[in-house]
Regions:
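N-terminal export signals
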Residues: 5-27
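Conserved beta-sheet core of the metallophosphoesterase superfamily
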Residues: 279-400
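Active-site environment of divalent metal-dependent phosphoester hydrolases
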Residues: 102-104, 128-130, 163-171, 224-227, ...
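Extended active-site neighborhood of metal-dependent phosphoesterases/phosphodiesterases
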Residues: 63, 67, 75-76, 135-250, ...
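Metal-dependent phosphoester/phosphodiester hydrolase catalytic core
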Residues: 80-95, 114-119, 158-160, 197-289
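N-terminal active-site segment of His-dependent metallophosphoesterases
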Residues: 34-139
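A short C-terminal boundary segment appended to hydrolase-like catalytic domains
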Residues: 38-68, 373-430
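Twin-arginine (Tat) signal peptide motif
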Residues: 1-7, 33
Length: 430
């Protein structure tokens, strides 16, 4: 499909994001007030952080968006939430994923975040590695992606990143840590790694007393010792080490005891209702997983303060995992999981496909524009859909227990269902 034709199709999705200007659908909440210092006319309806743009002009360029941003501040009277009078800011996250060498998009997205977002989260696949691509080429792609961030992150917005399956092929864990770990350390200076050469770690952001501290956990589903597996196998296999799971349990328990809210980020999502797990089941020679409920079970136990003692057998014979969590009076407040991989904007809750359990875990998947068209996005996983998303801004409100999500680009669900330009998503089931 030629690009011009695609843009015409993408125009069908214009109602999903609004045409030219700020959507006013959420102005009814009198408790939400805009910061008018960034408003072009000095007054506007209350809105989450949204730039005005003209969908008809969209050609994969975030630079087309007019710089009209709102720094939302919310005021509430004394109520059962106990926050008192005053204002508080939401945490603003720029989420990008699966850019696959399209570094112009990386630069535009990082530029968008300057002075507007509190953190940038990249959920992997900066490169386009495969078993046919050598180590030097893979490292070159990671270096170019890193340079794209460094060249545009002038205000030093904290930057967090995790491995994608196309990043790790034919390179070692040490290679990736040197290439991307140093980039993360340069902007998220207080990041705490799980071990000296690991790419799993956590980073805390305290917004204010009302919002509290949010702890970001970067997870590594390609956690192999250098030389442990052939490079091609690391491309195909999702595997946690016992050391990472022990770290995860300890770090989540510490968050619960300190009252930190938690966001996890990884290239893949969780649960056997996820698209990527279904694909792995359908073609086990292409992708393979440990138990898809290993991490959800851990989070669930710490959310409810219950015990979990279990041996998670790995049917592939790669890495069995032991979990031993004792009961606790502390309760983990879990916000969401950020992921990529499937080249599709998604939101759903982790659950067992047989209906036996629903986890209180919100999954938020990010898409990306293709540098060479949109072949994967438009047809591979969701026929009859348009999924040309550049990035999303997520406003996390820990008082309302919700996330305001705004995506930049064109999106039309495969079933033709309407999509709000601003999506308000509760992150707790109850």
């Amino acid at each position: 499909m030629k690009r011009r034709r695609f843009i015409k199709i993408a125009g069908l999705a214009a109602s999903a994001f609004g045409l030219g200007g700020i959507d006013t659908a959420m102005a009814a909440d009198s408790n939400v007030q805009p910061d008018l210092s960034h408003s072009p006319q000095g007054s506007a309806p209350a809105q989450p952080f949204v730039p005005a743009f003209d969908q008809a002009r969209f050609e994969r360029k975030l630079a087309d968006f007019e710089p009209s941003f709102y720094s939302v501040r919310v005021g509430r009277k004394n109520d059962d939430k106990g926050i008192g009078y005053g204002w508080y800011d939401r945490l603003k996250i720029l989420h990008i994923s699966d850019t696959h060498q399209y570094n112009a998009l990386v630069q535009e997205a990082v530029t968008l975040a300057q002075g507007r977002c509190d953190v940038i989260c990249n959920t992997g696949d900066d490169g386009n590695g495969s078993e046919k691509v050598g180590r030097e080429r893979s490292l070159e792609w990671l270096e170019k992606a890193s340079n794209a961030v460094r060249s545009t992150n002038a205000s030093n917005v904290p930057y967090l990143a995790v491995k994608g399956n196309h990043d790790v092929c034919n390179i070692t864990r040490s290679d990736y840590r040197r290439a991307i770990g140093s980039l993360v350390e340069g902007y998220a200076t207080s990041v705490v790694w799980g071990s000296p050469d690991a790419m799993f770690g956590h980073y805390d952001i305290k917004i204010n007393d009302s919002m509290g501290t949010i702890r970001f956990l970067m997870l590594d589903p390609f956690d192999y010792e250098d030389g442990q597996f052939p490079a091609v196998r690391s491309f195909m296999t999702c595997t946690f080490s016992q050391a990472q799971i022990d770290w995860l349990v300890a770090t989540l328990r510490d968050a619960a005891e300190k009252g930190c809210k938690v966001i996890t980020m990884m290239h893949y999502s969780f649960g056997d209702n996820s698209i990527e797990f279904s694909e792995a089941e359908a073609k086990p020679d292409a992708e393979s997983y440990q138990d898809p409920f290993l991490v959800p079970d851990i989070i669930d136990a710490l959310q409810h303060g219950t015990a979990l003692k279990k041996l998670y057998r790995d049917s592939r014979g790669i890495q069995d995992i032991r979990v031993n969590i004792t009961p606790s009076a502390s309760r983990l407040e879990y916000i969401c999981h950020l992921f990529g991989h499937i080249h599709s904007k998604n939101q759903y809750r982790c659950r067992k496909s047989d209906g036996s359990k629903d986890y209180d875990m919100l999954m938020l998947g990010e898409a990306a524009l293709g540098a060479y068209g949109n072949a994967l996005n438009k047809a591979y996983r969701y026929p009859n859909s348009v999924n040309d998303i550049a990035c999303s801004v997520l406003e996390v409100d820990t008082v309302e227990k919700c996330i305001y999500r705004v995506s930049y680009g064109s999106f039309m669900p495969y079933d033709g269902s309407p999509v709000s330009r601003i999506t308000k998503i509760p992150y707790r089931m109850q």
